[in-house]
UniProtKB/Swiss-Prot annotation:
Its main location: cytoplasm. It comes from Drosophila ananassae (Fruit fly). This is Eukaryotic translation initiation factor 3 subunit K. It is found in: Cytoplasm. Residues 46-208 form the PCI domain. One of its GO terms (molecular function) is translation initiation factor activity. Belongs to the eIF-3 subunit K family.
């Protein structure tokens, strides 16, 4: 769905065009931006710049604060881990947003993810499942982040542990994630995450530095 912003001169701009000019601070555009946030949740899309613009407008216009939109923005930031989007969004929150119980719950979920306590995360997510039920692809986005952490942590992992870390998934769902990440079954209930050949190999790099490149610097030291 295309969202157009109506300017005072009667012309229309796309949200991306509006965000590139002073109009991004016009509170008259807030409703359009909030509808755009809802569309991102529904259609599994993501626009960090637009979402941060919404939080900035709340800072300037606290009487227009919408907590439901705040929750959606923060949860969408979680779907883009390991990027630092959540930290940026959190820095724009007003005191009344920070005191909100649901906001604190989302912050707790973010902390749990950042310390890679995935078993606890899925337990808390189940308790609070209504909070992100409207966000299409939320669980798979988190599983993508979990897979990233697993890929940088393990060489091999037990199949039962892998299923647990990915949210207690069924065998059929596990197969799709194994295939998606290029992992392989080893037998004896193990999954190969990274082989020896996949490891990053160090390389010595020799750079030739001519005397004239450092001559001026050496002269200053005399």
């Amino acid at each position: 769905m295309s969202h157009l912003v109506k300017m005072e001169n009667g012309q229309s701009q796309t949200i991306q065009e509006m965000l590139g000019c002073i109009e991004r601070y016009n509170p008259d555009h807030l409703k359009t931006l909030e509808a755009y946030v809802q569309d991102q949740a529904k259609n599994n899309t993501y626009d960090l710049e637009a979402n941060l613009a919404v939080l900035k407008l709340y800072q300037f216009n606290p009487h227009m604060l919408n907590f439901d939109i705040t929750y959606t923005i923060l949860l969408k930031c979680l779907t883009n881990l390991p990027h630092t989007d959540f930290v940026m969004a959190k820095c724009l929150l007003l005191p009344q947003q920070m005191k909100d119980e649901n906001v604190q719950t989302i912050i707790d979920l973010a902390d749990i993810l950042e310390r890679a306590d995935f078993t606890l995360f899925w337990q808390r997510a189940e308790v609070n499942r209504n909070m992100f039920r409207h966000i299409t692809g939320f669980h798979d986005s988190i599983r993508k982040f979990v897979s990233h952490v697993i890929g940088t942590t393990f060489q091999t992992i037990r199949k039962d542990l892998l299923k647990e870390l990915l949210g207690g998934i069924e065998d059929s769902t596990l197969e799709s994630w194994v295939k998606r990440n290029g992992w392989k079954h080893q037998g004896q209930g193990l999954v190969v995450v990274a082989t020896q050949d996949d490891k990053i190999k160090t390389k010595n790099i020799t750079e030739k530095i001519e005397f004239e490149n450092v001559g001026a610097l050496m002269a200053q030291c005399l």
